[in-house]
Amino acid sequence: MGTLRRFPASVLQIALALFLLASGARDLVHVDAGVFNAAVYFLGGLFRGHVAIGVLTLAVSLCCLTAGFFLLVDFLRPELSCVSAVLALFVVLWALNMVLVDVVGAFGRGKVLQNVSSALEHLHHTAVDLLVLGALIFVRQHTR
């Protein structure tokens, strides 16, 4: 029965690990911050520099790769104790991204409510962010 209860968490953990690994690798190859791109450019604009954007992009990509790596390692070797701390840090990073992109960035530029298409696009992006945040929290609770 314990294995059957763990199955949904395992599937979600593998999916999340692959998503984060692929996102981090893609972001390094394409030199953008992927799902965090809007937040990186928002923060880069505050610091007024392309160097800040490059450093933030690299940091975000490495965070995605690190979180995905730890999730995959934890799936294969569940006795690893630092995974919960890494996931907690990534939950905070993801929530901060959501605030910066889905709230401050979107409504600050005033483009969300321009038309139905932009509102639906924003709603879709926010829903994806919430799904990933929920998956991170769920997997973190089940890796303890």
Curated annotation (Swiss-Prot):
Disulfide bond residue pairs: none
Bilayer-spanning residue ranges: 7-29, 51-73, 85-107, 122-139
Keywords, comma-separated and alphabetical: Cell membrane, Membrane, Transmembrane, Transmembrane helix
Membrane topology reported for the UniProt record: Multi-pass membrane protein
GO CC terms: plasma membrane
Subcellular location: Cell membrane
Superkingdom of origin: Bacteria
Keyword Transferase: no
UniProt name for this protein: Uncharacterized protein TP_0638
UniProt lineage: Bacteria, Pseudomonadati, Spirochaetota, Spirochaetia, Spirochaetales
